[in-house]
Amino acid sequence: MKKTMFTVASVAILGLMLLTGCGKMADSNKVEAFPTKAEKDTVKVSDCNQFEDFFTPAFQLVWNDFTDKIVGKKVEFIGGNPKIADEFNKQRLTDKMLSEKDYYKTVAPQTVKTKKTIEKELKKKFKEKSQLLDRISWLKKDDGVHKILYCMFKKNVYFPKVFDKLPPAPFITQNTSKTYYEMFGVIKNQSKFSHQVVPVYYNGNDDYAVKLLTKSDDEIILLTTTSEEPVLEIWDKLYSDKLSKNEHLTFDKNSKLLVPFINFKKEINYNELTGKPLANSNTVIDTALEVIEFSLDNTGAKIKNEAMMGVRTTALRPHEPQRYYYFNKPFVLFIRSKNGSVPYFALKVKDPKYLQKG
């Protein structure tokens, strides 16, 4: 007799990673949230970290442009890279892996004109307003020094059939509280959703995964795990061991599905990337911000992700000592014909006796 499959989304490679098909890892101690007003019914998350607990596309695309269009090579900081910089440098996700209809990005002078252009394009493409553009000052004219790198990614995916709303239930952990959370899924009429729910594997009550198919080509994949590994490593293992083989089970009358509603917002200030000299460029990052909003319910998933980087070019590469070729001390002077092997004049200046007084 088949075991009942009672699927609970107890952990996550959630839609933040799954809508784009990749994952990332992060420096858990350095990412800090900056103040904002959380929207109604949205949980403002402060204890999850980029690259450890979630993956998002916008800042990666900004970083890619910073690497390719500003620095011209892999980003390296003097004194070594923060862990998060090394992860961004891997460029696991590029714009070629995404549909152009899902994102807008630009690299431009940090001017009022650029700000207005971005606002116009966001309204035209996504009917959205930026939450980041007002966080920095904008120049009236291009000074040739300050540039802005910006990206917004927005995507909504919908289930072919709306899942049933189920009675609220607790979220099971080692310290399960008495709080109940909104749930959706399938408890009966399994045949109605058999083409929408694709079990990837089922190895017992605490080890299973499912794919939730959408109207588009996107898949929302949920698996149970208590692993402390970064989300990227969890994804790589899942893809290598299961998804790449395209094997699956059947969602039948003995199967049940239970998934929590998710609604959160995260704002990040990448302080560990700002104000630090680069070893291979005369550019300094002044601002590095990101906003992530994600929701999952019985109709589908929505992700809105915005990132912005402000950079400036310094007169000299900050890592190079200034070179003072000052001959106001003992020196020798030679004059020769071009490429001559012997100078036709030479003078040793040991003291100021040959110098002209000012």
Model region roles, listed by residue range:
Residues 23-358:
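Hydrophobic-core positions in well-structured secondary-structure elements of globular domains
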Residues 10-17:
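Bacterial N-terminal signal peptides
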Residues 1-9:
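Bacterial N-terminal signal peptides that target proteins for export
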